[in-house]
Amino acid sequence: MGISILSGILSSLSSIAQDPSPPPTNPPALPRHFIATVRSPSSVAKVESALSPLVKPSVSTLRVLQSTSNVSAAAEADIILLGCKPYMVSGLLSASGMKDALTVKHTEGHARSQKIIISICAGVTVPDLERVLREDVGLSADNLPIVVRAMPNTASKIRESMTVINTVDPPLPDTVTELLTWIFERIGEVVYLPPHLMDICTSLCASGTAFFALMMEAAADGGVAMGLPRAEANRMAAQTMRGAAGLVLEGEHPAILREKVSTPGGCTIGGLLVLEEGGVRAAVARAVREATVVASLLGGGGAKNVNGTRH
């Protein structure tokens, strides 16, 4: 996910540099210098290979380091994107030296701006992170970074993500909201929703990519079974799904769209009835519900099972 997000942002910065009149909605200070930390030398090589072609020296810089450099990277950064597994959050943030790296420094009576931690860890809430920062890291309330929870998806890589950002009370400063919006609009669409909806958003927006991929694959399988070459079947299924999504994003209700294509006695209504007989609608809805519960459990939420499919 981190590679996808950085890919989108670096590509966008390059596009802005080529545009003589960037849009006025850009925040005053765009992020231009990036440090990525990964766990192994092989991962360093993989990330460098994926991202280096997107770096324009006149626009942005990128360093890829091993996770042994997490503390120094955090100390240097103004914005920290936390993209580890949920169970790793406490250990990563409580590493030796991290407290000092995250602490607001005071110089000649002037405090440096708070760091911003953006978490994309499924199931980990803002209160969870703030509790780790206070209890495990040892930061005082005065030194807590600004903590933001966001949930993008893997389509960040092609700047087609659907990102949901957790609203907080009291609201974030306008400058922070503008910066967050700018960052995540570089990789797709952005909405702000309250905390109690975030696990649902994780299911629908992040896990949903896999759900829709399965449906697309199934449609292509049907075409292949009837004689289509695999490559053409995959392309047709993907483009048809993109077209349907585009119509809905333009304001067409899915039920109306379905009805418009279903002529009396036609092939579409026949196929739709097979889908209904197979319980596709209920199965997809149930998958979203189940993934929502699992997302809440990843962060230690302890939500009850809603579908009875796990023990």
Where in this protein do the model-derived segments appear?
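Internal alpha-helical scaffold of NAD(P)-dependent oxidoreductase catalytic cores
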Residues: 50, 128-146, 162-201, 211-250, ...
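Rossmann-like NAD(P)(H) cofactor-binding subdomain of soluble oxidoreductases
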Residues: 35, 41-51, 63-165
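Mobile beta-alpha loop/short-helix "lid" or hinge segments that flank ligand
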Residues: 5, 9, 149-158, 186-199, ...
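NAD(P)-dependent Rossmann-like dehydrogenase/reductase catalytic/cofactor-binding core
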Residues: 235-311
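A short glycine-threonine-serine/GTX helix/turn-capping micro-motif
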Residues: 202-210, 258
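A general structural signal for well-ordered alpha-helical segments in protein cores
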Residues: 2, 44, 77, 89, ...
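Small-residue helix-packing motif on alpha-helices
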Residues: 34, 44, 73, 89, ...
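NAD(P)+-binding Rossmann beta1-loop-alpha1 motif at the extreme N-terminus of oxidoreductases
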Residues: 1-76, 160-161, 224-225
